[in-house]
Protein backbone atom coordinates (compact mmCIF):
# COMPACT_ATOMS: atom_id res chain seq x y z
CA UNK A 1 0.00 0.00 0.00
CA UNK A 2 1.22 3.50 -0.85
CA UNK A 3 0.53 6.11 1.83
CA UNK A 4 0.82 9.85 1.28
CA UNK A 5 1.41 11.95 4.41
CA UNK A 6 1.63 15.72 4.69
CA UNK A 7 3.28 17.43 7.66
CA UNK A 8 4.77 20.68 8.87
CA UNK A 9 3.37 24.11 8.16
CA UNK A 10 3.34 26.16 4.99
CA UNK A 11 4.80 29.65 4.92
CA UNK A 12 3.57 32.46 2.65
CA UNK A 13 6.09 35.11 1.57
CA UNK A 14 5.33 38.79 2.13
CA UNK A 15 8.65 39.77 0.53
CA UNK A 16 12.12 38.18 0.29
CA UNK A 17 12.74 38.42 4.06
CA UNK A 18 9.27 38.24 5.67
CA UNK A 19 6.59 35.59 5.67
CA UNK A 20 3.41 34.49 7.39
CA UNK A 21 3.76 31.05 8.90
CA UNK A 22 2.51 28.92 11.77
CA UNK A 23 4.04 26.96 14.63
CA UNK A 24 3.62 23.46 13.21
CA UNK A 25 6.68 21.32 13.92
CA UNK A 26 5.77 18.35 11.73
CA UNK A 27 6.08 15.98 14.70
CA UNK A 28 2.72 14.29 14.02
CA UNK A 29 3.65 13.64 10.39
CA UNK A 30 7.05 12.31 11.42
CA UNK A 31 5.46 9.85 13.86
CA UNK A 32 2.84 8.78 11.30
CA UNK A 33 5.51 8.19 8.64
CA UNK A 34 7.73 6.21 11.02
CA UNK A 35 4.77 4.06 12.10
CA UNK A 36 3.71 3.34 8.51
CA UNK A 37 7.30 2.51 7.50
CA UNK A 38 7.66 0.15 10.49
CA UNK A 39 4.55 -1.69 9.26
CA UNK A 40 6.13 -2.13 5.81
CA UNK A 41 4.19 0.49 3.83
CA UNK A 42 5.59 2.67 1.05
CA UNK A 43 5.42 6.29 2.28
CA UNK A 44 5.59 9.58 0.46
CA UNK A 45 6.00 12.45 2.92
CA UNK A 46 5.26 15.96 1.69
CA UNK A 47 6.70 18.30 4.28
CA UNK A 48 8.34 21.66 4.79
CA UNK A 49 12.04 22.49 5.11
CA UNK A 50 11.81 23.29 8.84
CA UNK A 51 9.57 20.36 9.84
CA UNK A 52 10.80 17.34 11.77
CA UNK A 53 11.51 14.44 9.43
CA UNK A 54 11.99 10.70 9.87
CA UNK A 55 15.40 9.17 9.27
CA UNK A 56 16.08 8.07 5.68
CA UNK A 57 14.42 4.76 4.81
CA UNK A 58 14.34 2.72 1.58
CA UNK A 59 10.52 2.92 1.49
CA UNK A 60 10.36 6.67 2.21
CA UNK A 61 10.16 9.35 -0.47
CA UNK A 62 10.50 12.90 0.85
CA UNK A 63 9.10 15.92 -1.04
CA UNK A 64 9.68 19.45 0.26
CA UNK A 65 7.29 22.37 -0.22
CA UNK A 66 7.33 25.88 1.20
CA UNK A 67 3.92 27.36 0.44
CA UNK A 68 0.37 26.50 -0.60
CA UNK A 69 1.13 26.92 -4.31
CA UNK A 70 3.95 24.35 -4.14
CA UNK A 71 1.80 22.03 -2.00
CA UNK A 72 -1.05 22.22 -4.51
CA UNK A 73 1.30 21.30 -7.36
CA UNK A 74 2.72 18.30 -5.46
CA UNK A 75 -0.69 17.10 -4.28
CA UNK A 76 -2.17 17.15 -7.81
CA UNK A 77 0.64 14.82 -8.86
CA UNK A 78 0.84 12.59 -5.80
CA UNK A 79 -2.78 12.06 -4.70
CA UNK A 80 -3.75 9.98 -7.79
CA UNK A 81 -0.81 7.62 -7.13
CA UNK A 82 -1.70 6.74 -3.53
CA UNK A 83 -4.38 4.68 -1.76
CA UNK A 84 -4.30 6.63 1.51
CA UNK A 85 -3.73 10.30 2.37
CA UNK A 86 -3.07 11.41 5.93
CA UNK A 87 -3.21 15.19 5.65
CA UNK A 88 -1.56 16.44 8.85
CA UNK A 89 -0.02 19.62 7.41
CA UNK A 90 -0.94 23.04 8.80
CA UNK A 91 -1.83 24.79 5.54
CA UNK A 92 -1.92 28.58 5.36
CA UNK A 93 -5.44 29.91 4.97
CA UNK A 94 -4.27 33.15 3.35
CA UNK A 95 -1.41 34.41 1.18
CA UNK A 96 -0.13 37.99 1.00
CA UNK A 97 -1.13 40.03 -2.03
CA UNK A 98 0.18 43.51 -1.32
CA UNK A 99 1.67 45.45 1.58
CA UNK A 100 1.76 49.23 1.81
CA UNK A 101 1.87 52.09 4.26
CA UNK A 102 -1.27 53.22 6.05
CA UNK A 103 -1.04 56.68 4.45
CA UNK A 104 -1.37 55.20 0.95
CA UNK A 105 -4.45 53.24 2.04
CA UNK A 106 -6.02 56.32 3.61
CA UNK A 107 -5.57 58.28 0.35
CA UNK A 108 -7.10 55.55 -1.83
CA UNK A 109 -10.50 56.12 -3.41
CA UNK A 110 -11.16 52.39 -3.80
CA UNK A 111 -9.55 49.73 -1.61
CA UNK A 112 -10.16 47.11 -4.31
CA UNK A 113 -7.26 48.57 -6.32
CA UNK A 114 -4.85 47.14 -3.75
CA UNK A 115 -5.85 43.52 -4.35
CA UNK A 116 -4.62 43.79 -7.95
CA UNK A 117 -1.22 45.23 -7.05
CA UNK A 118 2.05 43.48 -6.29
CA UNK A 119 5.01 44.77 -4.34
CA UNK A 120 7.91 45.48 -6.69
CA UNK A 121 10.65 45.65 -4.04
CA UNK A 122 12.48 42.49 -2.98
CA UNK A 123 12.26 43.82 0.58
CA UNK A 124 9.45 46.15 1.60
CA UNK A 125 10.71 49.31 3.32
CA UNK A 126 10.41 49.43 7.09
CA UNK A 127 10.35 53.23 7.31
CA UNK A 128 6.54 53.45 7.54
CA UNK A 129 5.11 53.65 11.07
CA UNK A 130 2.15 51.41 10.10
CA UNK A 131 1.81 48.87 7.29
CA UNK A 132 -1.36 47.36 5.86
CA UNK A 133 -1.16 43.83 4.48
CA UNK A 134 -3.76 42.61 1.99
CA UNK A 135 -4.35 38.86 2.07
CA UNK A 136 -6.09 36.52 -0.36
CA UNK A 137 -7.79 33.26 0.67
CA UNK A 138 -5.94 30.12 -0.41
CA UNK A 139 -7.78 27.13 -1.86
CA UNK A 140 -8.75 24.42 0.64
CA UNK A 141 -6.54 21.65 -0.69
CA UNK A 142 -8.23 18.93 1.37
CA UNK A 143 -11.51 19.68 -0.43
CA UNK A 144 -9.84 18.95 -3.82
CA UNK A 145 -8.39 15.55 -2.90
CA UNK A 146 -11.43 13.47 -3.88
CA UNK A 147 -11.55 15.23 -7.28
CA UNK A 148 -8.01 14.02 -7.98
CA UNK A 149 -8.60 10.50 -6.59
CA UNK A 150 -12.19 9.55 -5.65
CA UNK A 151 -11.08 6.19 -4.21
CA UNK A 152 -8.42 7.49 -1.83
CA UNK A 153 -8.90 6.96 1.91
CA UNK A 154 -8.63 10.48 3.33
CA UNK A 155 -7.71 11.30 6.91
CA UNK A 156 -7.54 14.98 7.85
CA UNK A 157 -6.81 17.03 10.93
CA UNK A 158 -8.12 20.41 12.05
CA UNK A 159 -6.71 22.51 14.87
CA UNK A 160 -9.29 24.25 17.01
CA UNK A 161 -8.38 26.42 19.99
CA UNK A 162 -10.40 27.11 23.14
CA UNK A 163 -13.48 25.14 22.11
CA UNK A 164 -15.62 22.72 24.09
CA UNK A 165 -15.59 18.96 23.63
CA UNK A 166 -19.07 19.23 22.16
CA UNK A 167 -17.87 21.67 19.51
CA UNK A 168 -14.91 19.42 18.68
CA UNK A 169 -17.26 16.50 18.13
CA UNK A 170 -19.64 18.63 16.05
CA UNK A 171 -16.82 19.87 13.79
CA UNK A 172 -15.49 16.32 13.41
CA UNK A 173 -18.92 15.02 12.36
CA UNK A 174 -19.37 17.85 9.85
CA UNK A 175 -15.96 17.01 8.38
CA UNK A 176 -16.82 13.38 7.65
CA UNK A 177 -16.79 12.63 3.94
Task: Cite the ranges covered by each PLM segment.
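A cross-family phosphate/adenosyl-ligand binding-site feature
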Residues: 1-177
Amino acid sequence: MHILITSGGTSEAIDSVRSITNHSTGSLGKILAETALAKGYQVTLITTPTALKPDPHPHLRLLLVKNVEELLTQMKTEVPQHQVLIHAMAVSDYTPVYMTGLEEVEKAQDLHTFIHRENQEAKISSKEEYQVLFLKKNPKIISLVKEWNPAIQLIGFKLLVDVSSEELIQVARESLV
